[in-house]
A protein has these predicted regions:
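Bacterial Sec-dependent N-terminal signal peptides
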Residues: 1-19
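Active-site neighborhoods and metal-handling regions in enzymes and metal-associated proteins
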Residues: 19-314
């Protein structure tokens, strides 16, 4: 009998999926709560730590700054028109304020303060707000090294620069450290959710590496990749990056795991399977690599050394 040994518990996890993946409306409520905590509790700490007392983020609809994309309200799929949000932290009183200088409030968490009747020009309204706060530094998303911190377009930079007086132009600095800190720091609530993402990712891998999906001698690694993509869509999730599934065997095929031919390798008994897989859910992403072994016809279990290795590796 051709069998695949998965060196973690093989479960068909339809009940797991059904019970633990939230409907879209419930996801939106959770993300809104998550973002509120990040804006009100985490961001002031990061601004103080990185020495930025004002952070100006600007994006155009369908051309979003990568940082703004992480802040979008759950009911927004894109920025709207020209979206400007400003975070300010008083260095003395530690009062924190987040505002939108835009046509609309930025979801439930950031109100719009732009009075178009009083000041119809959006950029002048931004200038007026900056002047009222008189920050020591005006952080913007420009960076020579970090792509995620380099989301401000040349046009928007010019608009900001030109509307400010020389006094405030001198205060413009890169918010690179703050942007990266925002991206890399997770709250306790996010870590609770993240453990669920990891479980979902591993459950998909368990199913992908089972006889439900793989028939040794017939199924190719590329077949498994596309099954994983389809499974993610079926669950109402997103794939963070195109998965990789490759085989490692004595013929050194593992040396060519990322070339154009190896993705069509037929999975055989005795193969060590490797995958690199990630999903996106609740504004978080996973990047998971796990291994599995395909039993040879005469085997009832994997070699002991492999069992021990995969216990550590998986």
């Amino acid at each position: 009998m051709r069998k695949i040994l998965i060196l973690f518990t093989v479960l068909f996890v339809s009940n797991f999926y059904a019970q633990d993946i939230l409907p879209l409306k419930e996801r939106a409520k959770f993300v809104n709560k998550l973002q509120k905590e990040r804006f009100n509790n985490l961001l002031p700490e990061l601004m103080e730590k990185t020495g930025i007392d004002m952070w100006v983020l600007i994006a155009r609809e369908y051309n979003e700054d990568p940082i703004i994309k992480t802040m979008l309200p759950p009911t927004w799929l894109n920025a709207r028109r020209t979206t400007i949000i400003v975070f300010s932290l008083d260095s003395e009183t530690k009062n924190f304020e987040s505002v939108a200088i835009a046509r609309y409030a930025f979801g439930d968490n950031i109100p719009s303060i732009w009075n178009k009747e009083k000041q119809p020009n959006q950029w002048k309204a931004l200038k007026d707000y900056i002047v009222s706060k008189n920050p020591e530094k005006i952080g913007i998303n420009t960076s020579s090294y970090e792509s995620l911190a380099d989301g401000l377009s040349k046009y928007h930079y010019d608009q900001l620069y030109n509307v400010l007086s020389p006094k405030f132009r001198k205060k413009i600095v890169s918010a690179e450290d703050l942007a990266i800190a925002w991206i890399e720091t997770r709250t306790d609530l996010e870590m609770t959710a993240y453990s669920q993402l990891v479980e979902i990712s591993s459950a998909i891998i368990r199913e992908a590496f089972s006889t439900k999906v793989i028939t040794p001698g017939v199924t190719t690694t590329d077949d498994v990749v596309w099954w994983m993509r389809e499974k993610v869509i079926e669950l109402g999730l997103d794939t963070w990056f195109h998965p990789t599934v490759d085989v490692q065997r004595k013929d050194e095929s593992d040396l060519y795991a990322f070339d154009n031919n190896s993705k069509f390798d037929t999975i055989l008994p005795g193969d060590l399977l490797h995958c690199d897989f990630g999903i996106s859910y609740l504004t978080l992403n996973t990047d998971t690599q796990e291994l599995g072994y395909v039993l040879k016809p005469e085997e009832t279990s994997a070699p002991d050394f492999l069992v021990n290795a995969l216990k550590d590796g998986n």
